């Protein structure tokens, strides 16, 4: 079933501007509370001006341009401006340091970068090292340097026409983006995403949450992440909704922002749900218009119940990864939700649980979650310049090996167990880190928890828990281990625990376990 119908991203924005005109498309709020707002027509003009800016800097179809930006309207301008001229966006995680960023520039052969003044010192050093093809930087911000090879984004953009001046032939099969995975266990891989992928993501994710043009979708997810792009921005724009993009997440400000913009849909990762729950209860907790809160894994049943009871919201689960583009397994609009299931497979996909010999498993048995889609359309096209890695993950028939463990029940509901690489081998037993984290997170004194395996000469691996306590709480080792012994099998009880003030996380809120081993 082809729901895209041959429409590329240039056509999408021209059509949206014509259909919705003065309707609000994008609202952005900075950390300082400064709000910028754009209609569909004016946003399309900003995108066109940005496309012309890139053309004036020598960018043509097929060229790659890197973005290293926190959430801002300019990210949206650049993303779709590049797509309109057939160029390719390479977003860089805004939390990466110099060596990691230089590696992405080198491996994607990027010569032009758009970034903000706060990141410029790092990229000035990268240019001086001559270790990458980077030769020009377009800067966003005030008090900009007058260095060679540096241009001012706002000044250049303001001089451009609102009418597109370069319109090469585009196909939905053309690459629109190379999105490098977070690389928490190894060097990141460049996930190649096409125009079709992004258009499909818009329609699919809008269907998943029954999005309409009178909805307001608010997110704090980073724009350089697949979630913000394909689960929030693309569906919001595709449905003609209003997309609210916040610069950063603040637990104290979140509900005020939900009410301020009358958001009807938002999304939360477990860290957000936990930090929202430790905020003081208020009479306004249920005074909002939210009808759906999308969330992603690693939430205990008690946490889910407490959150929905306090704030009067529905949680909609969705499972996916960068390579799947969207949440290919999840709750369906109007469907019964079967906690702790991650839902059922969405339209246009197939899903199976397979064993180590790549054979399908019956209901109830744990194996690898495998997804069948169409490369370059409903799942990613390939890993950029890595054919061997592509072949390992993606079978010729379109079956994608996720590397995640799970099972399905007799009714076709799927259940996530853990990342296969996130299992601890302890004395012959496989122990799921997620299972232990869900159990331990129910302790009333614990705000956050992560479990890792550490080397053990006798039992392969020992289990260590890193915990963050709620403000003002104390927890002894005796109390912690007693709680574990009363709530899990003996072989699953951690051998060590360590109290931290915080846990290392990447841009999407995922804990970076390699930094704890």
UniProtKB/Swiss-Prot annotation:
It comes from the Bacteria. Catalyzes the transfer of CoA to carnitine, generating the initial carnitinyl-CoA needed for the CaiB reaction cycle. Also has activity toward crotonobetaine and gamma-butyrobetaine. Disulfide bonds: none annotated. It holds the Pfam family AMP-binding. The gene is caiC. Transmembrane segments: none annotated. This is Crotonobetaine/carnitine--CoA ligase. GO terms for molecular function: carnitine-CoA ligase activity; crotonobetaine-CoA ligase activity; medium-chain fatty acid-CoA ligase activity. Keywords: Ligase.
């Amino acid at each position: 079933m082809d729901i895209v119908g041959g429409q590329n991203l240039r056509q999408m924005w021209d059509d949206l501007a014509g259909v919705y005109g003065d309707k609000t498309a994008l609202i952005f709020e900075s950390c300082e509370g400064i709000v910028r707002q754009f209609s569909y027509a004016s946003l399309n003009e900003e995108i066109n001006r940005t496309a012309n800016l890139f053309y004036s800097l020598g960018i043509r179809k097929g060229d790659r341009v890197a973005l290293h930006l926190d959430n801002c309207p300019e990210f949206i301008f650049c993303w779709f401006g590049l797509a309109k001229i057939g160029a390719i966006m390479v977003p860089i995680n805004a939390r990466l340091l110099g060596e990691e960023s230089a590696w992405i520039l080198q491996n994607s052969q990027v010569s032009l970068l758009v970034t903000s003044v706060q990141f410029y010192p790092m990229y000035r050093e990268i240019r001086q090292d001559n270790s990458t093809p980077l030769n020009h930087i377009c800067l966003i911000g005030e008090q900009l340097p007058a260095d060679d090879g540096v241009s001012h984004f706002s000044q250049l953009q303001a001089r451009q026409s609102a009418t597109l001046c370069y319109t090469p032939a585009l196909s939905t099969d053309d690459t629109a983006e190379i999105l490098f995975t977070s690389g928490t266990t190894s060097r990141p891989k460049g996930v190649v995403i096409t125009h079709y992928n992004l258009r499909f993501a818009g329609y699919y994710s809008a269907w998943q949450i029954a999005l309409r043009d009178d909805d307001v979708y608010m997110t704090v997810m980073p724009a350089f992440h697949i979630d913000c792009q394909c689960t929030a921005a693309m569906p919001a724009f595709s449905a003609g909704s209003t997309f609210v993009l916040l610069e950063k997440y603040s637990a104290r400000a979140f509900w005020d922002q939900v009410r301020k913009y009358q958001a009807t849909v938002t999304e939360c990762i477990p860290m957000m749900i936990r930090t929202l729950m430790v905020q003081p209860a208020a009479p306004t907790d249920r005074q909002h218009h939210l009808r759906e809160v999308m969330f992603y894994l690693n939430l205990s049943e008690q946490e889910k119940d407490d959150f929905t009871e306090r704030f009067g919201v529905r949680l909609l689960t969705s499972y996916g990864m960068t390579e799947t583009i969207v949440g290919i397994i999840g709750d369906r609009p109007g469907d019964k939700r079967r906690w702790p299931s991650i839902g059922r497979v969405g339209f246009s996909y197939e899903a199976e649980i397979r064993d180590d010999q790549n054979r399908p498993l019956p209901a109830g048995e744990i194996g690898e979650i495998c997804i069948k889609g169409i490369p370059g359309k409903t799942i990613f096209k390939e890993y950029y310049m890595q054919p061997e890695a592509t072949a390992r993950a993606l079978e010729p028939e379109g079956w994608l090996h996720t590397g995640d463990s799970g099972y399905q029940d007799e009714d076709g509901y799927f259940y996530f167990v853990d990342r296969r690489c996130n299992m601890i081998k302890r004395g012959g037993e496989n122990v799921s880190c997620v299972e232990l984290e869900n159990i331990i997170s129910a302790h009333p004194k614990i705000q956050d928890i992560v479990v890792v395996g550490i080397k053990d000469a006798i039992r392969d691996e020992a289990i260590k828990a890193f915990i963050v306590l709620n403000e003002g709480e104390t927890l002894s080792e005796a109390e912690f281990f007693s709680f574990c012994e009363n709530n899990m099998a003996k072989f699953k009880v951690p051998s060590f625990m360590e109290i931290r003030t915080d846990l290392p996380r990447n841009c999407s809120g995922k804990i970076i376990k390699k930094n704890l081993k």
